[in-house]
A protein has these predicted regions:
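Noncatalytic N-terminal accessory/assembly modules of large enzymes
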Residues: 1-50, 58-61, 66, 80, ...
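A conserved beta-strand-loop-helix scaffold within acyl/acetyltransferase catalytic domains
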Residues: 4-6, 56-70, 78-83, 88-335, ...
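Alpha-helical interaction elements in eukaryotic regulators
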Residues: 40-44, 246, 250, 270, ...
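A residue-level signal for conserved active-site and pocket-lining positions in enzyme catalytic cores
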Residues: 48, 254, 378
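Short amphipathic alpha-helical interaction elements and helix-loop-helix interfaces
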Residues: 54, 260-264, 352-356, 384-387
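Eukaryote-specific, cytoplasm-facing alpha-helical/coiled-coil scaffolding segments in long proteins
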Residues: 73-75, 280-282, 402-407
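Aromatic (often tryptophan-rich) hydrophobic motifs at membrane interfaces
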Residues: 302-385
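Active-site/acyl-donor-binding loops of N-acyltransferases
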Residues: 356-420
Length: 477
């Protein structure tokens, strides 16, 4: 990286005490190692997440995989090879239809009628967002329809939407098949008129390239589109004018999301909590000649609908990847599948950055938890890999699923001879920060008075690996 030498400075907290698991609700089943990061380089964080670490604000933690109740496997998607599935295309088309025509999907599982953005009022001074009363938003259930037993004999029975195929009509055919048939008929008529045999061999169908992710995202909209959607990338920096100008609106959106989607109390989603969780990042903003134009670091990717923020994706841009941290959005737009839509946009963003920085070609989705069905959606962004918790090698998810079906914890790399190539070899070479002086742990240990802390330092260094141990400064009092 360009610029003066920067160091990562951490305080290691160890691990072993169980905490309540947010996935299976086990009171003390969540076990992890943790450390507080005062500052961190993007390269060090890249290497740490490639060893199973993950940050929440400035706290960096690593699940104790063979002991924790819900093992969490780091997952990454090969962004350059990604092709949207049918469900992904449906989500992209749904958003495009909403932007073009202003139609919100109905019939969602939450059973609520979603209000439009125009039901919101943003006061210029306080920026407090209010919405229409929720009374009357509950959708009434459809009345039961008594279908006659002899449908074709009832002259007053009309087939309607949602009632299946109309038996009185011929089966539907694909539009492209009908167009192909009409073209063939015209060609036969033309050749017959010219005295050529009307029996014409149909031209072999040309292989069409399937629409890619960017084709759906960049689809042209009508001039009179009902809405306008703009995606802005804002650095997490309180000295950045765009970040500070939108900060209060982001805070309020976060609180609304947490209370509606996760059932938090107002005290649990305060401004200070928002700042600690989604704004306080240990990552130092960095730039590099072969890196992306906006540099590396932590960013908020804001989705502005008609001039107001409706969703924010918190991401870290690292040397080899875009790492998804969190997403929050306006609950009234839940039917637009904003979680999946933002992930698709972030994959496209990764591909865009790769054109500027060739090494930056992966999209990290955080942790994959196979034992938690709600988290399995992350495995739908293919091709993707899971990180082996013992060798720290990447394994295609298709090879991992059968193992995880048999056991919550698994050594995903099935090569018995494979090992951790960055395993700790010499703890004495780990760097420590003691009384503002940087020194190898071996030198510090010779000076240290009192009981030995070698067991703790050995554990820390083995978890971060030899390379990181020789770069990261472990604070020693």
């Amino acid at each position: 990286m360009a610029g003066s030498k920067s160091y990562t400075i951490v305080e290691y907290f160890g691990g072993g005490d169980g905490y309540r698991c947010g996935y299976c609700k086990n009171d003390k089943g969540n076990l992890s190692h943790g450390m507080w990061s005062h500052t961190m380089t993007v390269q060090d964080y890249q290497d740490l997440i490639d060893r199973g670490w993950r940050r929440s604000g400035k706290y960096v933690y690593k699940p104790i995989m063979n002991k924790t109740c819900c093992p969490q496997y780091t997952i990454r998607c090969h962004a350059l090879k990604f092709q949207p599935s049918k469900s992904h295309k449906k989500i992209l088309k749904k958003m495009s239809k909403f932007i073009s025509k202003g139609e919100l999907p109905k019939g969602q599982s939450d059973g609520k009628l979603l209000v439009s953005l125009y039901g919101l009022t943003v006061h210029p001074q306080s920026q407090n967002i209010t919405t229409t009363d929720k009374e009357g938003m509950e959708r009434g259930k459809w009345g039961e329809i008594d279908c006659p037993t002899q449908k074709t004999q009832n002259p007053f029975f009309f087939w309607g939407p949602g009632m299946g195929a109309d038996p009185s009509r011929a089966p539907c055919r694909k539009a492209k098949d009908l167009r192909k048939e009409r073209r063939l008929q015209k060609e036969q008529m033309r050749q017959h008129a010219e005295g050529v045999s009307s029996i014409v061999s149909p031209t072999p169908p040309q292989m069409t390239q399937p629409k890619g992710l960017e084709d759906f995202i960049n689809q042209s909209l009508p001039e009179n589109a009902a809405h306008s959607l703009e995606v802005r990338l804002v650095p997490v920096d309180f000295e950045d004018p765009q970040f500070t100008a939108s900060y209060q609106q982001s805070v309020e959106l976060y609180a609304r999301y947490q209370m509606a989607i996760h059932g938090d109390d107002p005290s649990e989603c305060s401004e200070s909590e928002f700042r600690r969780f989604l704004c306080d990042s240990p990552l130092e903003a960095e730039s590099s000649p072969d890196g992306p134009e906006m540099g590396y670091g932590s960013f908020h990717q804001q989705y502005w609908l008609d001039g107001r923020i409706v969703a924010v994706g918190v991401i870290d841009v690292l040397p080899n990847c875009v790492s998804s941290v969190y997403l929050y959005y306006h609950p009234d737009f839940a039917s637009l599948s904003l979680g999946s839509y933002s992930a698709l946009r972030e994959i496209a963003f990764t591909r865009q950055l790769q054109k500027q920085s060739p090494k930056l070609c992966y999209y990290y989705l955080g942790f994959y938890i196979h034992s938690c069905p709600k988290m399995r959606y992350k495995g739908q962004y293919r091709p993707s890999d899971l990180l082996c918790p013992e060798t720290y090698m990447w394994v295609p998810i298709e090879r991992c699923i059968p193992q995880l079906e048999d056991s919550r914890y698994a050594r995903l790399n099935q090569d018995p001879d494979a090992g951790d190539c960055r395993a700790l070899k010499e703890v004495g070479r780990a760097l420590v920060l003691h009384r503002r002086a940087v020194m190898p742990y071996a030198a510090y240990a010779r000076k240290r008075r009192g009981s030995s802390d070698e067991t703790e330092v050995q554990q820390y260094a083995s978890l971060v690996g030899q390379d990181c141990a020789e770069r990261i400064l472990l604070y020693r009092a």
